[in-house]
Design a protein with these regions (language model features):
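Short arginine-rich
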Residues: 68-82
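GIY-YIG nuclease catalytic motif and its immediate N-terminal context
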Residues: 1-38, 44-54, 65-68, 85-87, ...
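Residues at or immediately preceding the N-termini of alpha-helices
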Residues: 26, 59-61, 75
Length: 112
């Protein structure tokens, strides 16, 4: 079975703290953040539960490489990515469905 990968950026309600991550199951991972599954996590500590940016990859490993690349960059670069895709910093998790893959690629194209 083919496994897609996703790089994502989340923030808090005030858009002051940014969190970058990568996963093979974006819907599930975002729900874990929103439901505060990991009790000692950065996202819980800073109340990060709003998905503001994501990229989809046809190869999962590419998403994890992208995460490393973006994490190494400046906050300004992260904000530029977000603003280009999502200028109003809306919570994109509202658009996600449990069926990923091609659906998420289609959603991402809507924001270009």
């Amino acid at each position: 079975m083919h496994q897609y990968g996703y790089f994502y950026i989340m923030t808090n309600v005030h858009n002051t703290v940014l969190y970058c991550g990568a996963t093979t199951d974006l819907y599930k991972r975002i729900q874990e953040h929103k439901n505060k599954i990991f009790k000692d996590s950065f996202t819980l500590k800073y109340n990060i539960d709003k998905l503001v940016y994501f990229e989809s990859f046809s190869i999962a490993g590419d998403a994890f490489e992208r995460e490393k690349q973006i994490k190494a960059g400046s906050r300004r670069k992260k904000i530029e990515l977000i603003v280009r895709l999502n200028p109003e910093w809306k919570d994109l998790s509202e658009l996600l469905k449990a069926n990923e893959g091609e659906e998420l690629i289609r959603i991402k194209r809507l924001f270009k």
